[in-house]
Amino acid sequence: MDRPDEKIKQHIPQDELLAQLAEECAELSQAALKLRRALTGINPTPVTVEEARKNLVEETADVYNVLGLLLDAVENAEIYDIIRRKKARWVKRLEG
């Protein structure tokens, strides 16, 4: 673990990191919905597609940042295995 991670974990307990993760996930959800509005134009927003996409990236980084503090390397490897399986299942559904 690198120094910034250690310092953060010394000051913020796991339950608070989980609360922060929930907050960041909510913000990511809002960013995704805002980008959808910007892309479709059905429910207009003053935010441009470019601004909305940048915000989505920013909020994604916030989620990754907190997850990096909560999960270890083994769990991260497991996540990528799960992602591969789920994508394969998704493709099968699309192909009927």
Residue spans for each PLM region:
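Flexible "arm" and connector segments at domain edges
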Residues: 1-96
